[in-house]
């Protein structure tokens, strides 16, 4: 149920967006896709672009590849470089905030599980994930030895986006939301009343 909630948060936001007539707006995909996802990033990009009368800019790549060399091949492709330059020019990002279960599920492709690849410090544990970036309860990034296999906006470039919106709700997401705010991975939060109340009480 919690995974379903995460998967539906951003797609539902896209579905509820009113149609607007905008000019010179581009909607850019920030990370690669998984075939098993209920709502793929490219599908969400298309939906938002349609609502805003904007141009979609898609990242045609998987989120996880088998080697550093394969990632470098993608990065060397002119089409990829064009999309990544668009990412660097982004003014606003919108991303769901996943909890620890989502972080573990995100990269689960074939026989690749995330747990053995986490480089945890003593006492550190996974609190959440946003845009493929995994963090602890205090918002500290958790390093992975497969970082060079992931195709997504790099953390340094993501944090340069001026307005970073996180979408998440429910009491079960509190640790993830808190970590995302402390990072700070986000500077705007869209959440539900219950989660907002609990965060304010801390």
PLM segments and residue spans:
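Alpha/beta-hydrolase-fold catalytic nucleophile elbow
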Residues: 28-30
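Conserved phosphate- and dinucleotide-binding cores of soluble alpha/beta proteins
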Residues: 20, 32-202
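Helix-turn-helix/homeodomain-like alpha-helical modules used for DNA recognition
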Residues: 1-19
